[in-house]
Regions:
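Long, low-complexity, charge-biased intrinsically disordered regions
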Residues: 1-197
């Protein structure tokens, strides 16, 4: 079985409480890692609210039948304000991984897979630019439930009656254009490749 990814609402329709539990776990991790700080929607002017990135919650149905949620930012708005060379990261291309694996397998080479849990959430955002993100509807409410003492008072109601929560990103969140750069810089400072003599 291949991993299948769903949007938040589709995952809740298909998996019910399993999806809700996965989302709650992800939001709790994001809160515990201090990935963002809540902002008072009433004090934000039109321009910062307009530039705020939309939040996206994905839920993956993994091969072991577990569900894994991932909170992302929709970084498309950032493309309008950044040059391509500002967002280029020295991370590996997915195609390169598969090509290398296709060569290594028949040659019986040793390989290793390394997973850095919450890798992006370990990297700080750049202080040069304030990045705001907005969480809407159920996601805003679930974030408030994850840590009511922190987020509840910042959940605002729009004129249409929808809940919104504006947050300032403090950590590199998946989906932001510079997140891979920040993550690579964060781990690159502590990682030293082992060389053979």
């Amino acid at each position: 079985m291949v991993m299948t990814q769903y949007g938040y609402k589709g995952a809740v329709r298909k998996f019910g409480t399993e999806a809700t539990n996965a989302v709650t776990k992800e939001l709790t991790q994001v809160h515990n890692r201090e990935a963002f700080s809540p902002q008072d929607a009433g004090s934000l002017s039109y321009e910062p609210r307009r530039r705020a990135l939309e939040s996206i919650m994905h839920v993956k149905h993994k091969r072991d039948d577990s569900k894994k949620a991932r909170l992302c930012a929709d970084g498309r708005k950032q493309r309008l304000t950044m040059r391509k060379d500002e967002t280029t990261s020295p991370t590996v291309c997915t195609d390169s991984v598969f090509i290398t694996a296709a060569i290594e397998a028949p040659e019986n080479r040793r390989t290793a897979v390394v997973d850095l849990p919450g890798a992006y959430l370990s990297a700080n955002m750049d202080d040069e630019e304030e990045v705001l993100m907005v969480m809407r509807g159920d996601l805003a409410e679930m974030m408030a439930l994850a840590a009511p003492e922190v987020y509840r008072k910042y959940v605002a109601i729009t004129p249409e009656g929808k809940k919104v929560l504006y947050v300032k990103l403090c950590k590199a969140l998946y989906g932001c254009l510079k997140s891979a750069c920040f993550s690579t810089a964060s781990y690159g400072a502590t990682y030293t490749p082992k060389t053979s003599s």
